[in-house]
């Protein structure tokens, strides 16, 4: 991708300075929402249906079209093939700013509902509290939930955007195989826009505090992705990924954890403004996004499926393993397992 920056030379004559950035694909003004969905999200959906984890998010300055892009992707997701036979689909939508987390689909109409909490269990699993999970029987049910979540997003007028998203919007789609009990997850994240000092110069104290929280969480997200990208390269061991510093990166821990047994995939969509007045911020966005790309052939080969890990056992395997190890002590193994797979028993 080529970015052209208008400048004035030392002689006073105008000139154009060019910068080149490498990405896997660049979408132009002729690209449609279905085009973007097909190239960026459709492969993640297939992986999610196979019990894997996928994350897609849009990053860029406020007013560059992130929410429009992610709304288009969510609309296409509602019409996708996730509602296949033998698959249970659940949907959750959270809004996050710093340590403050809101469940946009909470049933409690109280203006001060119970606070949402995200933490890490002793076994490494991510645990949530006061988060509602909504079963979706078909695309119409998912559409209704997505529409409700959109209407409850926190927005405010800023210098660049009359309806700027002031928090990260996180849609979580879970697709569980009824037979095995293994659920794949897809996180669709509409990040709040990054803002420069120029963008926020007219903010009041509340907006300034929001901007500080937004930029801090975006900085940590970029640091985690860069570290994880480096760790994917052969010979790059001992790299620390600081996903525990922020609730957003903790929530999608599987994407960043080195050695995670679940196959995870991440897609970063970089949104830039076409305005000449925004070229400095656009170049800065491209500069930070470019290194997040993993070159083809350099990714770390995924770990082989560990047959000894209970998370990989089907219902039948869980019953057989428990019978072999503790059959006489457990008694009725089928009642003990309760039709749960290894990942559920675990």
Per-range role (PLM):
Residues 1-38:
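Charged, amphipathic alpha-helical linker segments immediately N-terminal to NTP-binding catalytic cores
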Residues 30-34, 130-136, 161, 198-216, ...:
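Flexible beta-alpha connector loops of hexameric P-loop NTPases
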Residues 38-49:
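Pre-Walker A adenine-sensing motif
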Residues 49-180, 243-250, 266, 273:
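Conserved nucleotide-state-sensing and coupling region of NTP-binding domains
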Residues 65-67, 99-105, 196-199, 235, ...:
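Switch/connector loops and helix/strand junctions flanking conserved nucleotide-binding motifs
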Residues 185-203:
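Switch II (G3) loop of P-loop NTPases
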Residues 302-338:
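Sterile Alpha Motif
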Residues 336-346:
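A short amphipathic alpha-helix within small helical-bundle interaction modules
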């Amino acid at each position: 991708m080529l970015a052209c920056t208008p400048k004035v030379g030392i002689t006073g004559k105008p000139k154009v300075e060019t910068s080149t950035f490498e990405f896997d694909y660049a979408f132009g003004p002729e690209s449609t929402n279905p085009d973007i969905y097909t190239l960026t999200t459709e492969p993640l959906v297939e992986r999610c249906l196979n019990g894997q984890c996928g994350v897609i998010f849009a990053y860029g300055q406020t007013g560059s079209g992130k929410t429009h892009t992610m709304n288009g992707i969510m609309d296409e997701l509602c019409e996708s093939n996730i509602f296949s036979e033998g698959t249970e689909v659940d949907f959750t939508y959270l809004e996050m700013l710093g340590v403050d987390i809101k469940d946009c689909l909470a049933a409690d109409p109280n203006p001060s509902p119970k606070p949402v909490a995200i933490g890490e269990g002793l076994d490494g699993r991510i645990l949530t509290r006061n988060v509602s999970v909504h079963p979706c029987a078909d695309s119409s049910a998912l559409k209704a939930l997505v529409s409700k979540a959109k209407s409850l997003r926190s927005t405010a007028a800023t210098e660049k955007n009359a309806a700027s998203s002031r928090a990260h919007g996180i849609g979580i789609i879970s697709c569980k195989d009824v037979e095995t009990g293994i659920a794949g997850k897809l996180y669709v994240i509409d990040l709040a826009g990054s803002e420069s000092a120029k963008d926020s110069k007219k903010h009041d104290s509340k907006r300034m505090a929001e901007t500080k929280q937004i930029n801090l969480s975006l900085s940590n997200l970029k640091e985690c992705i860069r570290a994880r990208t480096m760790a994917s390269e052969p010979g790059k061991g001992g790299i620390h990924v600081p996903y525990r510093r922020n609730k957003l990166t903790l929530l999608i821990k599987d994407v960043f954890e080195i050695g995670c047994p679940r196959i995870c995939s991440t897609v970063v969509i970089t949104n830039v403004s076409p305005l000449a007045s925004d070229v400095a911020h656009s170049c800065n966005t491209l500069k930070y996004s470019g290194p997040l790309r993993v070159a083809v052939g350099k990714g770390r080969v995924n770990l082989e499926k560990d047959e000894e890990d209970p998370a990989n056992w089907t219902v039948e395997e869980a019953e057989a393993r428990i019978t072999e190890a503790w059959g006489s002590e457990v008694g009725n193994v089928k009642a003990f397992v309760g039709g749960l797979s290894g990942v559920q028993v675990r």
